[in-house]
């Protein structure tokens, strides 16, 4: 009976020295941990596995990304989402749905072609533009094509959006 009283007393007094040591160790180890990778290639390199073996779930639908979606994710320069020590990405369907949602909910303004340079005060080559359909970064040729055809650039959630060469053919 005395053992039950002492275990109750020690629980009331707070954490035992052993558990506080573990807490301190966990805190110290978090300072020593390398930063979590932002790309799937970076994750594969960290884990020392081939890219083909990376199975990453979509943050929105929960399906695992296909190999093609894994490659597209890094090519689009999107960042992995870390929740604790679990990693998530975004599949092609959810990426398109997210882009559409952002455009519909957070649209700010539209400029035509070369007007983007006067609005931003930057050369078209220095303005980051993502596709408003698939979220790919546009390259210089795609941005110049939009300028030359006097197509719109849209400001959405503080970032510029245009249409990439791939999505342009589906409209």
UniProtKB/Swiss-Prot annotation:
Cell location: Host cytoplasm; Host nucleus
Zinc finger (unnamed): 58-94, 131-167
S-S bonds: none
GO BP of this protein: DNA-templated transcription; regulation of DNA-templated transcription; symbiont-mediated perturbation of host apoptosis; symbiont-mediated perturbation of host ubiquitin-like protein modification; symbiont-mediated suppression of host innate immune response; symbiont-mediated suppression of host type I interferon-mediated signaling pathway
UniProt keyword Transcription regulation present: yes
Database matches in InterPro entries: E6, E6_sf
Biased composition (Polar residues): 17-28
Gene Ontology CC annotations of this record: host cell cytoplasm; host cell nucleus
Family matches, as Gene3D superfamilies: E6 early regulatory protein
GO MF assignments: DNA binding; zinc ion binding
Highest rank taxon of the organism: Viruses
SUPFAM superfamilies recorded: E6 C-terminal domain-like
Keywords for the protein's UniProt record, in alphabetical order: Activator, DNA-binding, Early protein, Host cytoplasm, Host nucleus, Host-virus interaction, Inhibition of host innate immune response by virus, Metal-binding, Modulation of host cell apoptosis by virus, Transcription, Transcription regulation, Viral immunoevasion, Zinc, Zinc-finger
Chief site of localization: host cell
Disordered as annotated region, ranges: 1-28
Functional summary from the UniProt entry: Plays a major role in the induction and maintenance of cellular transformation. E6 associates with host UBE3A/E6-AP ubiquitin-protein ligase and modulates its activity. Protects host keratinocytes from apoptosis by mediating the degradation of host BAK1. May also inhibit host immune response.
Subunit architecture: Forms homodimers. Interacts with ubiquitin-protein ligase UBE3A/E6-AP; this interaction stimulates UBE3A ubiquitin activity. Interacts with host BAK1.
Similarity comment: Belongs to the papillomaviridae E6 protein family.
Cross-referenced HAMAP family: HPV_E6
Name assigned to this protein: Protein E6
């Amino acid at each position: 009976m005395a053992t039950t009283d002492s275990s109750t007393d020690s629980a009331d007094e707070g954490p035992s020295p052993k558990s506080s040591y573990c807490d301190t160790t966990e805190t110290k180890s978090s300072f020593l941990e390398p930063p979590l990778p932002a790309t799937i290639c970076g994750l594969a390199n960290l884990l020392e596995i081939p890219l083909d073996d990376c199975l990453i779930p979509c943050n929105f639908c929960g399906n695992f990304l296909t190999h093609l979606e894994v490659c597209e994710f890094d090519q689009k320069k999107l960042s992995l989402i870390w929740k604790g020590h679990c990693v998530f990405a975004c599949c092609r369907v959810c990426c398109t749905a997210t882009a559409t949602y952002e455009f519909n909910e957070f649209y700010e303004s539209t400029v035509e072609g070369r007007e983007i340079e006067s609005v931003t005060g930057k050369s078209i080559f220095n303005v980051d533009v993502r596709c408003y359909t698939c979220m790919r970064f546009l390259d210089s040729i795609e941005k110049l094509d939009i300028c030359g055809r006097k197509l719109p650039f849209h400001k959405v959630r503080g970032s510029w959006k245009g249409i990439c060469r791939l999505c342009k053919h589906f409209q």
